[in-house]
């Protein structure tokens, strides 16, 4: 039944489901599961992944808790990547790379925050001493 408008409640539910699903794409083991079950070879599913690219728009991306899911969504647009995901070693490699990225990101962010805090402390103006230097 084409042309039927969805209710606000239906739109909210669809938004929630698509948000959850897109974020699941950040999990390489889930991607491996989808590939091994054949979903990534099905044209309707591949078309759905293409449809979900709207999540890259800032008005939608701001709701994502795991923004690297967008990178996975982008990679899933390529047939070669979808085929490689059948291999558990591929999923394991992606998982390891994600862990390394977050470890490096966390350390770098902590160092940056410490450096900024030190810089702010050094830039704070010192209170002038109020020595009585009035001359008559």
Curated annotation (Swiss-Prot):
Q: Which GO terms describe its molecular function?
A: transcription coregulator activity
The Gene Ontology biological process terms listed for this entry are:
regulation of transcription by RNA polymerase II
Which stretch is the leader sequence?
A: none
> Where does this polypeptide localize?
Nucleus
Query: What ranges does the record give for the region Disordered, renumbered to this chain?
Result: 117-136
Q: What the protein does?
A: Component of the Mediator complex, a coactivator involved in the regulated transcription of nearly all RNA polymerase II-dependent genes. Mediator functions as a bridge to convey information from gene-specific regulatory proteins to the basal RNA polymerase II transcription machinery. Mediator is recruited to promoters by direct interactions with regulatory proteins and serves as a scaffold for the assembly of a functional preinitiation complex with RNA polymerase II and the general transcription factors.
Share what the entry says about its subunit structure, partners included: Component of the Mediator complex.
Q: Under what name is this protein listed?
A: Mediator of RNA polymerase II transcription subunit 31
């Amino acid at each position: 039944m084409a042309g039927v408008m969805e209710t606000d409640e239906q739109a909210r539910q669809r938004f929630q489901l698509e948000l959850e699903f897109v974020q699941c794409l950040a999990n390489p083991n889930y991607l491996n599961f989808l590939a091994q079950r054949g979903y990534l070879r099905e044209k309707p599913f591949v078309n759905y992944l293409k449809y979900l690219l709207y999540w890259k728009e800032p008005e939608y991306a701001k709701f994502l808790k795991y923004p690297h899911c967008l990178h996975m969504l982008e990679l899933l647009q390529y047939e070669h990547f979808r085929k490689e995901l059948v291999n558990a070693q591929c999923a394991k490699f992606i998982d390891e790379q994600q862990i390394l990225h977050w470890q490096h990101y966390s350390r770098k962010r902590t160092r940056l925050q410490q450096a900024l805090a030190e810089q702010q402390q050094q830039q704070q103006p010192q209170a002038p001493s109020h020595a009585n230097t009035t001359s008559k």
